[in-house]
């Protein structure tokens, strides 16, 4: 993730972040406290709403596509290899996982 503009951690400011993926990445169900605007710049990104991951619900967004995810709406996604998306909105940018065990930054149990 690269910050393009603003500070995603500074409350009340506007931020723009860019995410590039090399391989395929599954994004488990989560939500954000603020509205999220997603634009596909390259490749494909698949998105769906709901609190349970269901690949059959994913809708493919191609370059130039834009989607708005309202604050607190549960959603999930799938990055195809080599895609680039840009996300902007009002900070702070925070990810709240529907299932905390899905958080990729969570320490692994020993």
Describe the function of each predicted region.
Residues 7-9, 24, 45, 51-72:
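Short acidic-glycine-tyrosine-enriched beta hairpin
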Residues 37-39, 68, 84-88:
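Active-site scaffold segments
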Residues 1-29:
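A short glycine-rich, His/Asp/Glu-containing loop-to-beta-strand
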